[in-house]
Amino acid sequence: MKKLLLLLILLIFAAKVTAEEWAGADEKAEEVIKELKPDYEPWFSPIFEPPSGEIESMLFSLQAAIGSLIIGYFLGYYRGLKHARNA
């Protein structure tokens, strides 16, 4: 019951937070660099630049989903090993 309540509180909090608060660290760092040194030239350019923000968001979500699947698989695998040893 406590886990469900905590999850509901977390979901309500996430729904109330604005998009600006979820901005990426690289965007915030870029703003700070431009303020401190406006003539700064980046030494690296991306290999692939997504054509739109929606595609960039989709690729980020896909990356997060794949990472979550891998972590979930190994957590389940080791939990299964633990239960098999105790049986």
Curated annotation (Swiss-Prot):
InterPro entries found in the cross-reference section: CbiN
GO molecular function: cobalt ion transmembrane transporter activity
Superkingdom classification of source: Archaea
Entry keywords, A to Z: Cell membrane, Cobalamin biosynthesis, Cobalt, Cobalt transport, Ion transport, Membrane, Transmembrane, Transmembrane helix, Transport
Cystine crosslinks: none
Pathway: Cofactor biosynthesis; adenosylcobalamin biosynthesis
Oligomeric form and interacting partners: Forms an energy-coupling factor (ECF) transporter complex composed of an ATP-binding protein (A component, CbiO), a transmembrane protein (T component, CbiQ) and 2 possible substrate-capture proteins (S components, CbiM and CbiN) of unknown stoichimetry.
Function, in words: Part of the energy-coupling factor (ECF) transporter complex CbiMNOQ involved in cobalt import.
Family statement drawn from the similarity comment of this UniProt entry: Belongs to the CbiN family.
Protein name, per record: Cobalt transport protein CbiN
Organism, as annotated: Archaeoglobus fulgidus (strain ATCC 49558 / DSM 4304 / JCM 9628 / NBRC 100126 / VC-16)
Lineage: Archaea, Methanobacteriati, Methanobacteriota, Archaeoglobi, Archaeoglobales
Gene from which the chain derives: cbiN
